[in-house]
Design a protein with these regions (language model features):
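Glycan-recognition and catalytic cores of secretory/periplasmic carbohydrate-active enzymes
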Residues: 1-309
Length: 311
């Protein structure tokens, strides 16, 4: 177990506030960081920390153990990534457990629509609640669907996707029109000057749509990936790289400016990990296939195949 706040400030509060404590959320980001660090450096020290943490979570949560998911999804996609990278299927199985627990309120109080906990994910058809929570949950859902080849997760995924794309997405790719819940309201409620459009939500759109592409090979989701990379995400960062938007409204009376930092600085740190990873979205491989997913000046080498793109 690793959570500096709980361990140093409230050591008796482990797993006590699943709705708002963000323990599994933070664990998921640690796992993602560990995989990225090992890929970049070949060093496995942080990966071993993440593996031990995942083993602790697997010992505490699951059938016959704790059944409650985290109020802020993230652990789901991270466990699949850790499972793929380490070759340990039990982590992906734990991710599937957390996905299926969303909306199942056996022995606990529901987190409600805000955390997409109002209905089992396999029964959901509409995008609701907190935008970033939704993107991370459905990214994990797509990962689980791809890992286990589970079409029953892909069908609701695309029902939710259509509702989002057709009725609740701005022309910039921004999502989440309301600051009140940092998320969604009703269909076509897309005001310009009060648009919330959190930077992290656009990054979440990138993550989810890229995963839907990897799971299905569909090109329409790549249009969304491209829109987020060119529009939804960059607006959150000043050209000098030293000031940030948390929300990205489409209109301003001059009173909305980028700032150096926030009390809750998820957006700057999310940008810091996203921009260096753009290369991973350009190409993909499948059985006897090589996909060019984005038109970008790039080069790819894979075994006997070399591609050069000057777009």
């Amino acid at each position: 177990y690793l959570n500096t706040y709980v361990q140093l400030v409230k050591p008796a509060e482990r797993w006590k506030d699943m709705a708002h404590g963000h323990e599994l959320y933070c664990a998921g980001h640690l796992m993602e960081a560990a995989v990225a660090y090992t890929r970049a450096t070949g060093k496995e020290l942080l990966l071993e920390v993440a593996r031990k943490f995942a083993e602790r979570i697997d010992a505490d949560f699951g059938p016959g153990k704790r059944l409650d998911p985290c109020g802020h999804p993230e652990i789901e996609l991270a466990l699949v990534e850790l499972g793929r990278f380490t070759g340990e299927p039990r982590f992906a199985k734990l991710a599937r457990f957390f996905v299926d627990q969303r909306g199942s309120t056996q022995g606990r109080t529901s987190f409600g629509e805000y955390a997409q906990d109002h209905r089992l994910v396999r029964e959901q058809t509409e995008i609701v609640g907190h935008a970033v929570r939704a993107m991370y949950l459905y990214s994990g859902m797509a990962d689980v669907a791809a890992y286990f080849r589970d079409e029953t997760l892909l069908r609701p995924s695309f029902a939710i996707w259509r509702d989002l794309i057709e009725t609740k997405t701005y022309v910039t790719g921004g999502i989440g029109s309301s600051a009140a819940n940092e998320g969604f309201t009703k269909a076509y409620d897309l005001p310009n000057d009060t648009a919330y459009c959190e930077t992290c939500a656009s990054i979440g759109m990138l993550l989810w749509n890229h995963r839907l592409f990897l799971a299905t090979g569909r090109s329409d989701v790549l249009d969304v990936v491209e829109k987020e990379l060119y529009n939804g995400i960059p607006s959150g960062l000043a050209l000098a790289g030293d000031r940030f938007f948390y929300g990205n409204p489409l209109a301003s009376r001059g009173d909305h400016e980028r700032v150096p930092w926030f009390d809750c600085s998820c957006c700057p740190t999310n940008l810091a990990r996203t921009l260096p990873s753009v290369g991973q979205y350009v190409y993909a491989t499948g059985p006897e296939r090589l996909y060019v997913a984005l038109f970008a000046q790039s080069r790819a080498d894979r075994k006997s195949t070399r591609l050069n793109s000057s777009h």
